[in-house]
Curated annotation (Swiss-Prot):
GO terms for cellular component: cytoplasm. This is Probable cytosol aminopeptidase. Presumably involved in the processing and regular turnover of intracellular proteins. Catalyzes the removal of unsubstituted N-terminal amino acids from various peptides. Mn(2+) 2 binds at K262, D267, D285, E346. Disulfide bonds: none annotated. Pfam families: Peptidase_M17, Peptidase_M17_N. InterPro entries: Leucine_aapep/pepB, Macro_dom-like, Peptidase_M17_C, Peptidase_M17_leu_NH2_pept, Peptidase_M17_N. GO terms for molecular function: manganese ion binding; metalloaminopeptidase activity. It comes from Rhizobium etli (strain CIAT 652). Its cofactor is Mn(2+). Binds 2 manganese ions per subunit. HAMAP family: Cytosol_peptidase_M17 (MF_00181). The active site is at K274, R348.
Length: 496
């Protein structure tokens, strides 16, 4: 659950209680709103004593003196004005949100002397607040004393010259926050509460936003020949599902764009079982499906002028007596056969049938799949970049640019025939692993065999979707990575 900020925008604010948050660049002599919030002029003295200079994300937190119109004043540094980016405004909003405690009212003054703050910057600041406010504590019956406990509802007035423009831009920010926080919720849910059926039901809830949602059952997938996906699912008593989400915001004649997510709701590794230490984190092995669901939420909420498909393959990988074995050969929906070398390389088996189904049914402009697919990508890139693999240079370049814009960064990895041959099998058309070397690359090549000539990109988000370092806009174990990135891609290039 999240702390609720009721955010509004105004050209001015009449202060009579609560908290005032003032912004200051490194160059400015005074903070925005200082005359209004601090008629006694104590900020300058406090800043001198604390050696506060307006360094980026540094904060000066003081109790307001008697006679001031507020109880607390926080001055937040922005750093050098010339170096401010959209992501810096996002971070500033998150940093500001972290200071809103024990109050039900706050005013934020954005217009720093000598700095032009446009409507987009104000909306980005507000988005940062909403992303930072997220927490997942619905299963806690008691809160620790040191945990942040903002009021259930805080009225926040953001003071900026272009208040009307900021209000208009903020509607998209609310949509983005809703999608990111939905993805975070899904990743954070315990696996006993979120199986394939329950996840599919969460996707079905998007119908209230105008998304068309179909849920394919095991029987329907078997009829379609999805032997790869069903092979993963057969070791669990929880039945698999394939959720197909359609947002029809574009022209009827326009081909859709498509996003496919790996949704392994819990991954034991199957018969090739994982070590016990850290296995609890495998509840997050559906981070790709969570991101796709969150993206569809955003597109529908902001009424994006595009036709978009979201498909998520939902299974649980368990090691019971009916589980698939190393050495099994399964037949995918494409008709290609796969030798299962390692049952812990299951995500690609789920995705290959979902990719083929998407391409065969919808004939999309492109397909982008997201998956917490390999530990190898974490070794290569850590949790700073997600791995990007693509058969299309234009799509890759657009994704990379969207990643830089949103700070959900991607790093393009190589593909090539020398890697592809590593997944050739003696007994089937291919095998599901290529050995220890180049593990993330051979996994991508496996997927590439199921996309034909359609422009395609694979995002390996194993290092960024869960357990990534906390920062100004994310304090959650499940980060919601990919939602903002893909929304920016759609917004920049694919809306009518």
């Amino acid at each position: 659950m999240s702390a609720k900020f009721e955010i509004s925008f105004s050209k001015s604010a009449k202060l009579n209680s609560g908290l005032a948050i003032l912004l200051k660049t490194a160059e400015a002599d005074a903070a925005a709103g200082a005359e209004t919030a601090d008629p006694a002029g104590v900020i300058a003295k406090a800043a001198k004593i604390a050696r506060f200079s307006g360094k980026s994300m540094a904060a000066l937190d003081i109790v307001a003196p008697e006679g001031a119109p507020v109880e607390r004043i926080v001055v937040l540094g922005l750093g050098k004005a010339a170096e401010l980016t959209a992501h810096d405004w996002l971070k500033a909003g998150g940093a500001a949100a972290s200071k809103i405690k024990n109050t039900d009212r706050a005013a934020v003054f954005l217009d720093v002397p000598g700095l032009t703050t446009d409507a987009r910057a104000a909306a980005d600041f507000a988005l940062g607040m909403l992303l930072r406010a997220y927490s997942f504590d619905s299963y806690k019956t008691k809160k620790n004393d040191d945990e942040e406990k903002p009021a259930k509802s805080v009225k926040v007035t953001i003071v900026t010259a272009d208040a009307s423009g900021a209000k208009k831009a903020f509607s998209d920010s609310e949509a983005i926050a809703g999608g990111v926080n939905l993805a975070r919720d899904l990743v954070n849910e315990p696996p006993n509460a979120l199986g394939p059926v329950e996840f599919a039901a969460r996707a079905k809830e998007l119908e209230t936003l105008g998304v068309e949602v179909e849920i394919l059952t095991e029987k329907e997938m078997r009829r379609l020949g999805m032997g790869a996906l069903l092979g993963v699912a057969q070791g669990s008593v929880r039945p698999p599902r394939l959720a197909v989400m359609q947002w029809k915001g574009g022209r009827a004649k326009d081909r859709p764009i498509a996003f496919i997510g790996k949704g392994v709701v819990f991954d034991t590794g199957g018969i090739s079982i994982k070590p016990a230490a850290g296995m609890e984190d495998m509840k997050g092995d559906m981070g790709g499906a969570a991101a796709v669901t969150g993206l569809m939420h955003v597109l529908a909420s902001r009424k994006a002028a595009v036709n978009a498909i979201g498909i998520i393959g939902l299974v649980e990988n368990m090691p019971d007596g009916n589980a698939q074995r190393p050495g099994d050969i399964v037949t995918s929906m494409s008709g290609q056969t796969i030798e299962v070398i390692n049952t812990d390389a299951e995500g690609r088996l789920v995705l290959c049938d979902a990719l083929w189904y998407c391409n065969d049914r919808f004939k999309p402009q492109f397909m982008i799949n997201l998956a917490t697919l390999t530990g190898a990508i974490v070794v290569a890139l850590g949790n700073v970049h997600a791995g990007l693999f693509s058969n299309d240079d234009q799509l890759s370049a657009r994704l990379t640019a969207a990643g830089l814009s949103t700070n959900e960064k991607l790093w393009r990895m190589p593909l090539g025939k020398d890697y592809d041959k590593l997944i050739d099998s003696k007994f089937a058309d291919m095998k599901n692993t290529g050995g220890r070397q180049a593990g993330s690359i051979t996994a991508a090549h496996f997927l590439k065999r199921f996309v034909q000539d359609t422009p395609w990109a694979h995002l390996d988000i194993a290092g960024t979707a869960m357990g990534s370092p906390q920062d100004e806009i994310n304090q959650s174990w499940g980060s919601g990575f990919g939602v903002r990135l893909l929304d920016e891609l759609v917004r920049a290039h694919y809306e009518a």
